[in-house]
Design a protein with these regions (language model features):
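Short functional hotspots where side chains directly engage DNA or cofactors
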Residues: 212, 221-223
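A donor-sugar binding/catalytic signature common to diverse glycosyltransferases
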Residues: 198-206, 211-212
Length: 264
């Protein structure tokens, strides 16, 4: 890039490190930069780390069936079977945004969120007011998938829509409906992305169950400045080892891609 475009980055990165030293903090961390920003951070002495998340890519699909057509027959049949099983529950599932999301919806989703977070992590870091403020200040970016049994909300998945990406955030359910998690979190997100011509759905980390549903591994990036030389050296060795393992995992996962070979 021209030197003029690099100047703001250089100034920002140097200022960040200078501030970290002045404050006497032990470390400084930059998470989820773009690949280009990540490489520039490395030139300023930060340790470069890669991670792995599972994302769905919209290849110009006009419908969910278009997406299914790119999968091998076994995975295609499995997804259709899962969606049919959810349909048999008789639930009403819809995607809500903006003014369509009421306080009653947020009350229900907060219950779902608490049920999941308390069960998995033992504590909920978001309070009820947060969700009202989210709807008030970012309502048009919120995509709330709500599943209702009659008039009663029973499950929900919270997403945020960006310029070209739908970001999956939280999920919860008050009842056990087979395959509903996959429907609400993955298939409904794909439906929404296709309808709104979004290029990506980011479903986050942890992924063998996501891969067979069309979400493939994609590298994420972070950069780390560590004040103590000894600790920095140890972390650098760990990152190198971890990167080799991530590269290996990605190759193994992609070798078992659900997509037809002519689509990989």
């Amino acid at each position: 890039p021209p030197r003029s475009t690099l100047f703001p980055y250089t100034t920002l990165f140097r200022s960040m490190i200078k501030l970290a030293r002045r404050l006497g903090v032990s470390s400084l961390h930059v998470t989820f930069p773009t690949e280009a920003e990540w490489k520039r951070l490395g030139k300023h002495g930060l340790l470069l780390r890669t991670g792995q998340q599972f994302h769905w890519h919209n290849r110009g699909y006009e419908s969910f069936d278009d997406f299914l057509a790119d999968l091998n027959s076994r995975k295609r049949k499995a997804i259709r079977k899962e969606r049919a099983a959810v349909a048999k529950h008789g639930l009403h599932i819809r995607a809500l945004s903006g003014a369509d999301i009421t306080e009653a919806h947020w009350d229900a989703f907060y219950r779902f969120y608490r049920g999941t977070s308390d069960k998995k992590w033992g504590a909920s870091y978001l309070n009820r007011e947060f969700f009202s403020l989210l709807g008030e200040r970012m309502g048009e970016s919120v995509v709330l998938i709500i599943a209702e049994d009659g008039d009663r909300p029973v499950a929900g998945a919270l997403n945020l829509a960006g310029r070209d990406t739908l970001f999956g955030r939280n999920w919860g359910s008050e009842a056990d409906y087979k395959f509903l998690h996959f429907e609400a979190c993955y298939y409904q997100a794909i439906d929404y992305a296709i309808a709104h011509r979004l290029e990506w759905v980011e479903a986050g980390a942890q992924g063998p169950h996501k891969v067979q549903r069309g979400y493939l591994p994609r590298l994420t990036y972070s950069a780390h400045w560590i004040a103590d030389p000894g600790l920095k050296s140890a972390v650098e060795r760990f990152i190198a080892s971890e990167r080799r393992e991530i590269d290996y995992q990605m190759k193994m996962i992609l070798a078992r891609s659900p997509f037809r070979r002519d689509q990989c």
